[in-house]
Structure formats: structure tokens, C-alpha cells
Amino acid sequence: MTTIVSVRRNGQVVIGGDGQATMGNTVMKGNVRKVRRLYNDKVIAGFAGGTADAFTLFELFERKLEMHQGHLTKAAVELAKDWRTDRMLRKLEALLAVADENTSLIITGNGDVIQPENDLIAIGSGGPFAQSAARAMLENTDLGARQIAEKALTIAGDICIYTNHNHNFEELPSKA
């Protein structure tokens, strides 16, 4: 799987991810870009799960953003509705972490849209490790969002065999 982490702090929101793609217990590629910008660079998103499934979801989510003039929550809810009701989409196995300047959300394959506590998201196989590390740093340091995301991904990569140390990040200014 993978690790995606999103942190919002001090006027910044960042989503970072590792670059490992696996098939079973074999590493197939080490530099997959799982984090990207959407909707005229106003939304950042990361995926955990099947790569082909995630690219399909990115494309569908970007269409929803276009339909709803960039309104993140509305687009996420509409994607989740489609994901839940469309027979083909239900077979897709991926999670999305998405953020704009105001909101951070998790969109699940079950059709759920979750606004996380403390604006901290960590998904994928290394998610629990990254979340624990990031939460400790949020509560006990003055580090910025990018530094926290970097360190959380590094810790997850040290522990989770499906997460590597080839990281990619996208950042936006945050109003939240």
C-alpha cells in the first residue's frame, strides 16, 4: 500500500506521500507520484490504494470540482455518492486525502467523507504510524506543517514495509 499524510498548521496545509508501489510483497516501483494538485492548483490530493483506481478517482474528483466551482466539500460528497452507488466505482480500492485552503477531507471507498480531527490525515498501510508521529509533533513541538509531514512519513517508512523514503509533497496556504 502506501502512506499519505496531511497536516494543517500555521497558515499552511501540506499533503505528502511516499513513492512505493507494490504488487503483493514485491516492490514494483519506488518513485510513484501519489500527491498532486487539482482544480487550477487550488486543491491538493493524495491517494492510497491501487494506482489505476486512484488515477480514476482523481479524474472523477477533478470533474466534480469543476462541476461545483471548486467547492471541496460538495465535490467530495458528490464523488462519494457516485462511488457508493455506481457498480463499477464500488470495485475501486483506494482512499483519497484532499485539502484546499479551508478544509481537509478523507474520501473512502465506502462512500464516506470524513473531516478529520485536528486537520490531521494519515491513510494507507503506514497511516497509523504517520498519524501517531504527526500527532505527537503537533502537540509537543512548534514545527511547521511541512516539517511534521516529512518527519511523519520518514517514521512510517522506517516501520511499514509498504512505505519507502521517496517522498513527494504539495502545499497550499491555509485560512483554517
Swiss-Prot record:
One Gene Ontology molecular-function label: threonine-type endopeptidase activity
Lineage, opening ranks: Bacteria, Pseudomonadati, Pseudomonadota, Gammaproteobacteria, Enterobacterales
PROSITE patterns, sorted: PROTEASOME_BETA_2 (PS51476)
UniProt: Na(+) binding residues: G157, C160, T163
GO cellular component: HslUV protease complex; proteasome core complex
Key words, A-Z: Allosteric enzyme, Cytoplasm, Hydrolase, Metal-binding, Protease, Sodium, Threonine protease
Reactions listed under catalytic activity: ATP-dependent cleavage of peptide bonds with broad specificity
Subcellular location(s) per record: Cytoplasm
GO biological process: proteolysis involved in protein catabolic process
Subunit structure: A double ring-shaped homohexamer of HslV is capped on each side by a ring-shaped HslU homohexamer. The assembly of the HslU/HslV complex is dependent on binding of ATP.
Enzyme class name: hydrolase
Source organism (scientific name): Photorhabdus laumondii subsp. laumondii (strain DSM 15139 / CIP 105565 / TT01) (Photorhabdus luminescens subsp. laumondii)
Residue positions of the active site: T2
Activity regulation summary: Allosterically activated by HslU binding.
Top-level taxonomic group: Bacteria
Official protein name in the record: ATP-dependent protease subunit HslV
